[in-house]
Amino acid sequence: MGKLTALDNIIQAAKASAAELSEVTASAGHVPAHTGFPAPGEAPDHILVRGDNNAVMRQLLACGYGGAFQCIYLDPPFLSGADYQATVRIRSEKLGEELSVKVPAYQDTWTDGKGRGGSEEGREAYYKMLAENLVLARQLLADTGLLWLHLDWHTVHYARVMLDEIFGEERFLNEIIWQYKSGGSTKKHFARKHDTILVYAKAADYRIHIDKEKSYNRGLKPYRFKGVEEFEDETGWYTLVNAKDVWQIDMVGRTSAERNGYATQKPLALMERIVKASSEEGDLIGDFCCGSGGFLEAGAKLGRRTAGCDRSMLAAALAEKRLLDGGYPYQRYDMDAESLPEGSDGDFTGQDSLLGGLKPADRTMLQRIASEDPQALVLFETALPDGRRRKVDVFGRETVISCTEDA
């Protein structure tokens, strides 16, 4: 079977599955009790879910969010065949110790039970995931809404074919090239220094805001045509023109204050530009592969309402901390809850999966910090409605502390 034929079969299956969901939701006539999400008009400004994005989008549709999103940004795995790590930094002032350890962030290897990433079975599993998410995202979008799909050279060519089929070729708006300086190089091919973001509209009457950028193509001489407003800075004379489809924005540097250690973290400047281009204050926007929450923070900062999810404990915790630190009202939901026992401060044992890849010295130090200064492992705390406190540690694990334990 040819690849395009296989892709078409995957797309048609995804459409059929989404259509079946729409029929079930419509025939029910009410929000299923198990969904747990508030109705669109009753939701807080920001919703964050820990769970599989396909399941979360289906639940949102079941709760009446179809057509509610003005913008959806998707930054899925790229089918790179690699497993990614996050850097977790721990500082114990009590012990005078600092520790930096690498822990699993997410896997970008794919299997359907027969093969791994790179195999035909693995590729088919990946494209099945992508097609289903794109179909669901389209259903969540408003008629004036835009989808932004962020990929790279591994799969963007096949994703374009998918989007043409799901949204329609006539709904393609742009292929944004995000150009950056970071990354390696090799003698085997030209250095790869960009990602690609495909932009599609749901319908013909879409909304988009094109920003302006400086154009210095006249050197130091002022423009001589009447009616053209020109400006001067230290570089020379320039006019303001509609922005182009190549965006030069640096990656988050290793020493940047913005950096939180999560693998493949995207810069806030890139996220803010997408938010501004595709939405207005008060609009609902979504990121259903939210990672450490950069898009959600950008949206909240710019006055948008947001909804996002990630299946990783660590990613969801980092995204929540962004909202918490910014003082933005949000509600956190867990579809894949994995909490520590009530009252536990997160003691680490030799069997703990988090310790498996650590060096012996790092493992010993982490166990010592957990034993003698457990508060150093706390990323943040929140109060629960019943008066208990919820603690989230630097690895994204959760525990609940009752009021009596503080007495």
Predicted features, each with a name:
Residues 65-146, 211-234, 301-302:
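SAM-dependent methyltransferase catalytic-core segment centered on the flexible catalytic loop
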Residues 37-41, 102-120, 249-260:
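Short glycine/proline-rich turn/loop motifs
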Residues 67-86, 163, 285-299, 308-309, ...:
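Conserved proline-anchored active-site loop of SAM-dependent methyltransferases
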Residues 51:
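Cofactor-binding loops of NAD(P)H-dependent oxidoreductases
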Residues 1-41, 45, 54, 61-70, ...:
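Accessory, often C-terminal, charged low-complexity segments
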Residues 130-133, 147, 159, 266-275, ...:
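Extended, hydrophobic alpha-helical segments in both membrane/secreted and soluble proteins
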Residues 77, 151-153:
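Short strand-turn motif at the edge of the Rossmann-like AdoMet-binding core
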Residues 47, 146-150:
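Short catalytic-loop micro-motif centered on adjacent basic/acidic residues
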